[in-house]
Amino acid sequence: MTKITIVKCPQCGTNVEWGEQSPHRPFCSKKCQMIDFGEWADEENAIPGAPDMSDSDGWSEEQY
């Protein structure tokens, strides 16, 4: 017997069955997925930790 895994949509809290029948998992819908993406793009969400202020990417804000 296969155990069905149910997770809560991180955006609205709706129960979502974790499997191929839920293409937007862990979200319940494309709408919730896009709302979450927008929050990350607007920097409303962030991964905790100190910001990396090094210039290791080779880019600089100085004009030449």
Curated annotation (Swiss-Prot):
Acidic residues bias: where? Answer: 54-64
| UniProt xrefs under InterPro entries | DNA_gyrase_inhibitor_YacG, Znf_NHR/GATA
- Top-level taxon of the source organism: Bacteria
Q: Where is this region: Disordered?
A: 42-64
The UniProt keyword set, sorted, is: Metal-binding, Zinc
- Molecular-function annotations in GO: DNA topoisomerase type II (double strand cut, ATP-hydrolyzing) inhibitor activity; zinc ion binding
Q: What is this protein called?
A: DNA gyrase inhibitor YacG
Read off the lineage from the record.
Bacteria, Pseudomonadati, Pseudomonadota, Gammaproteobacteria, Vibrionales
The encoding gene is yacG
